[in-house]
Amino acid sequence: MSAPTLDVESPLAASTSSLRAMNMVSSHTTVAKDEIYDLLGIGFGPAHLALSISLRESSEANETNFKAHFLEKRGHFAWHPALLLPGSQLQVSPLKDLVTLRDPASTYSFYNYLHSHGRLARYINKEQGVPSRREWTSYLAWAARRMNQAVSYGQDVISIEPLALASASPDAKQDTVAVRPASAQEADSLCLYQVRIRDESTGHIVNRYARNLSVAVGGVPKLPPAFQAAWDEQQRAPHSIPRLVHSGFYIPSMLKLEPELHKAASLRHPDAAAQLDDSSRLRLAVIGAGQSSTEMFMNLHSRFPSAIVTMIFRASALVPSDDTGFVNSAAFDPERTDEFWQASETQRRKWLQEFKRTNYSVVRTDLLNELHDAMYDKYEVQLPEELQDPTEKQAGRMEMRRCTEVVEVTPLDDGIQLTMRDNLRNAKLETIRFDAVFLGTGFIRSPSKMRFLEQLKPFYPALDAEWMSRDTIAEEDEVSKSIDVEDEEVIERRREMLRGITRDYRLVPASAMQSDAVRSGKSSPGSGSDASSTSSQQTLASENSTENLPEASLYVLGGNEATHGLSDSLLSIVAHRAGELTTSLLQRLPRTRRGTASSAATQPAASTVASAAKTSPTVSVTQTKARQAAQVVNDKLAALSGLHLDATS
């Protein structure tokens, strides 16, 4: 099978139009059609790596010459490199790799990686049922190397400008297309994105054009409120020694910080043979009670055995993660995404709260037991002095401050001062100086935090944090009570409008937000079917646009926990979702190109999605009946003016 066009675009060569259009489009400009990508993916972690493989293995993508490429800011592939600590284990089954849930026969599976490296039998003989994080990183890097032609590294996306057709009737026979800057008031005419990219090695800036964008760039550090000002101050001095370290930067930060801490320790205690007291020891704090906090806690004790390392958290105890079969199935199986999507907001919130124990502020049981046993043996079991190893007298300690909250953070020249409230002792306040503080407080994965999407905020309400935080419980609950098989298309439309995103991860444009019709299930005054036709263009899979340049779509991955479930940012779903995205992208090709492909999607991803559709009316309508149903939906919306969409209407 020949590879689709995504495999011939590396490295990104500066094309004629790219060099000609170094700045954002100020008026009309022309773009060569052969320079337009069907998809540009921003970020190249597991989510987009899985998608690139799915596209390569898709027969339909080959037949239609689907042109895709991915951009990664780092100079090479990496997966959570900041916490690649010795002994750290993967927290998910290795069968939830890049491909297996989409196509178990793919050569990009974890087990084929082991086989190709001649160690499948040795892996089977391992006692641990999951690979180390080190081995999983090696697997991902192996797959990424095989996809090298699909990605350009060292490419920083600066901004994205939405473009519209300059002519209402473009000439399909021309090799170029005329475009102009799009207006948020006419987002339904948005047909292209201009992506401005800086090459990190040369500083050169080029523009690329794409019909579809997919964003999967991970998250930004989530900081407790008390730490925000100190963090911001430190960020303004990027070349200084970091005393406040988030887990997302742990190993790179330690390259600077560790020598400084060892130097400070030797200055305080120049005589290595003398007895150490607490005033001479390094003091290090770890904030949080989850997996990353625990790993940093143990690693810091290993790096600085004579230091006092304190773990500070609000909970009563460290809690094990629930990775039992029933819970894993209920929270992370692929079909749960459909179940979650179709549920009301009230039900989705309950599920998120219920299944937090699988992923948030929890620790793998084996690591938890290892830590508990080490602390018990070291601090509870006392040997007679004559039997003690001489180094024990110099040893530091690990300690935990549970039920404790940090209320004030004061940066110092050589450390951080924390004021803490001890909720076990009548909210008593205590202030302690630490040489460094480490935050295992998680990440924020909202697309509203991505600066390069700033120009698109007027076009997509879901990019606005305030819009996303509005209360829609009543409207969502009304939708869930209104479900009628006959009107499933209408119900699906309302879900998309309320959430600002579709089931297949496309953001809903502002022009589709007919607020009266969306929020009450009514057509707005004077709207009728014409008003809702704009909505139908933007949602489901309908295309009321030119044959050669359908409407542009923005896919967002990893920031949709509230609408698609806990697995959205996790490895559990990447393979299956890659198949869904492949199907969605191919369905949105121009009609003239779709006609060149065989009628059936022959890749396993398509069959996987089709299988899911049998149990999900939403997926079935979205992926197989949307275009035929669009006009029917519009007629229904008009006919239902003034009526709620319930079974008795």
From Swiss-Prot:
Q: Which pathway does this polypeptide act in? A: Siderophore biosynthesis; ferrichrome biosynthesis
Where along the chain is NADP(+) bound?
A: A289, G290, Q291, S292, R314, N359, Y360, S361
**What is any one GO biological process for this UniProt entry?**
ferrichrome biosynthetic process
**InterPro entries membership:** FAD/NAD-bd_sf (IPR036188), Lys/Orn_oxygenase (IPR025700)
User: Where along the chain is FAD bound?
Assistant: E72, K73, R74, G75, H76, F77, A78, W79, H80, Q91, V157, S569, L570, L571
Q: Which residues form a coiled coil?
A: none
What this protein needs as a cofactor is:
FAD
A single Gene Ontology MF term assigned here is: ornithine N5-monooxygenase activity
Annotated substrate binding lies at K96, N328, S329, A330, A331, N359, S572
User: Is the keyword Kinase assigned to this protein?
Assistant: no
- Biased composition of type Low complexity is found at 520-536, 596-611
For this UniProt record, the keywords arranged alphabetically read as follows:
FAD, Flavoprotein, Monooxygenase, NADP, Oxidoreductase
Annotated stretches, region: Disordered = 512-547, 585-611
Subunit structure, per the record? Homotetramer.
What is this protein's function?
Catalyzes the conversion of L-ornithine to N(5)-hydroxyornithine, the first step in the biosynthesis of all hydroxamate-containing siderophores, such as ferrichrome.
What family is this protein classified in?
A: Belongs to the lysine N(6)-hydroxylase/L-ornithine N(5)-oxygenase family.
Q: What is this protein called?
A: L-ornithine N(5)-monooxygenase
Which gene is this protein's source? SID1
